[in-house]
């Protein structure tokens, strides 16, 4: 190798000479790198999508929520709301949080005249009820209208559909409730009838009647009677427990955030009841850590399956690449011996082989992450994933923005370059002078 000929020009000249083999090698390297980059992107993307789907559609919708109940006086409810909102945001590791509340009164006795003949309480025990301020998004008015704020002693209220039917009450009726805690009676006027928008919604976990309208235990309890939130700010009715339901927006959660989210949920559920604004009477519950554990185990199984497929493809691609590399080195053996005969050192030959390998590796490393997005979408559009409607964020920008995909592409491309380089080096370094003839010439 003379100084007059630069290594780059020599590499290009050799490439033109062996175009078919180099094209086969380039195609093999590109396919290997693109497929492994796609499997990496697919594993990450399907993991993130599966996690979000599992959190958004759990077996029990209440499992991914944070529920808190506490006895809070009327003058401390605003501070309690702030404390719960901040605590819920911390419990969900900073994710956007939606907070719904249920504020209720103490227990009241219904007038004896309203007892249905088939639902009479034993002895002199009255049927019970209570008032509550409910989240308006969780109810549907079926008759009349929602209660409004009133200035006088009379309180407007709406009854659950089932309770109104059992008690024989309708919009326009009036009744007086007796406070079971020796407080003043509550004078009500029925303005409407409602039912839960979704009786299975987690929100109704805050209601001791579970949104059913009637519960028969030792007492028969009807309710809750829906009242305007302003009713609970004064002393017109007795004070009962308050409930909060916090739900998070999991649309941006990724699998690398699972551990932090699990730990935050555990800490948050333990820390919230100790907040000063809640008076030390609160209880907080969430099943989010258990849900994350189940999802993580499922993801480990799916990733193990992908790992097996990846190893099989790697072995197949490696064999094909070594075969092409051996053919290429065989074709170039004469050129390599000629370079050595003209005074080129083994280091120069090795550098030349490395430059030739980089011609294959660099395009593959650059193109594989860009091809991974469309290939991932192609995989996701087939089979069970397409049938269940699992949506993957597999755009070119999203996949190309994953550092892991670029690292895998670079690593695989360099590995392929090494696989192409080694046969050329070993064949040239082991080639030497022919052995002596067996006899005299």
Language-model segment annotations:
Residues 1-24, 45-50, 54-60, 330-348, ...:
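Feature of multi-pass inner-membrane transport and sensor proteins
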Residues 1-317, 382:
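Membrane transport/envelope proteins' first extracytoplasmic loop
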Residues 31-38, 313-324, 363, 367, ...:
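Hydrophobic alpha-helical membrane-associated segments
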Residues 167-169, 321, 330-333, 341, ...:
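Short, glycine/acidic-rich beta->alpha junctions
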Residues 172, 343, 368:
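Conserved G/P- and acidic residue-centered "switch" motifs that form tight phosphate/ATP-binding loops
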Residues 298-325, 351-352, 356, 401-408:
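Membrane-entry segments of alpha-helical transmembrane domains in multi-pass membrane proteins
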Residues 353-370, 406-413:
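Selective transmembrane-helix segments that form parts of the transport pathway or gating/packing helices
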């Amino acid at each position: 190798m003379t100084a007059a000929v630069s290594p780059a020009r020599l590499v290009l000249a050799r490439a033109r000479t062996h175009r078919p083999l180099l094209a086969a090698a380039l195609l093999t390297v590109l396919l290997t790198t693109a497929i492994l980059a796609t499997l990496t992107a697919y594993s990450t993307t399907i993991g993130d999508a599966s996690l979000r789907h599992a959190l958004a559609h759990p077996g029990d919708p209440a499992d991914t929520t944070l529920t808190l109940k506490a006895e809070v006086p009327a003058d401390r409810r605003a501070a309690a709301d702030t404390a719960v909102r901040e605590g819920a945001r911390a419990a969900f590791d900073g994710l956007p949080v939606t907070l719904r509340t249920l504020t209720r009164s103490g227990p009241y006795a219904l007038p004896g005249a309203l007892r249905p003949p088939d639902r009479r309480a034993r002895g002199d025990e009255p049927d019970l009820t209570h008032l509550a301020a409910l989240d308006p998004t969780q109810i549907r008015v079926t008759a009349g209208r929602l209660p409004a704020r009133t200035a006088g002693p009379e309180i407007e209220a709406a009854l659950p559909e089932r309770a109104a039917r059992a008690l024989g009450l309708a919009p326009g009726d009036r009744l007086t409730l007796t406070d079971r805690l020796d407080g003043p009676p509550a004078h009500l006027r029925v303005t409407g009838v409602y039912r839960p928008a979704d009786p299975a919604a987690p929100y109704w976990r805050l209601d001791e009647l579970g949104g059913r309208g009637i519960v028969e235990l030792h007492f028969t309890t009807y309710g809750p009677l829906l009242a305007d939130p302003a009713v609970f700010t004064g002393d017109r009715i007795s004070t009962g427990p308050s409930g909060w339901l916090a739900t998070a927006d999991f649309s941006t959660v990724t699998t690398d955030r699972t551990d932090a989210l699990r730990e935050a949920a555990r800490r948050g559920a333990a820390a919230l009841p100790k907040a000063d604004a809640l008076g030390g009477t609160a209880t907080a519950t969430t099943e989010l850590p258990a849900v994350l554990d189940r999802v993580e185990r499922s993801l480990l199984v799916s990733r193990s399956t992908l790992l097996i497929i990846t190893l099989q493809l790697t072995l197949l691609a490696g064999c094909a690449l070594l075969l092409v590399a051996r053919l290429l080195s065989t074709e170039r053996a004469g050129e390599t011996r000629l370079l050595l005969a003209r005074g080129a050192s083994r280091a120069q030959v090795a550098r030349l082989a490395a430059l030739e390998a980089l011609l294959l590796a660099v395009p593959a490393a650059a193109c594989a992450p860009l091809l991974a997005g469309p290939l991932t979408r192609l995989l996701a559009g087939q089979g069970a994933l397409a049938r269940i409607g699992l949506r993957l964020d597999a755009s070119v920008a999203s996949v190309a923005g994953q550092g892991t995909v670029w690292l895998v592409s670079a690593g695989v491309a360099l590995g392929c370059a090494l696989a192409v380089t080694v046969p050329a080096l070993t064949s040239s370094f082991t080639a030497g002078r022919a052995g002596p003839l067996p006899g005299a010439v």
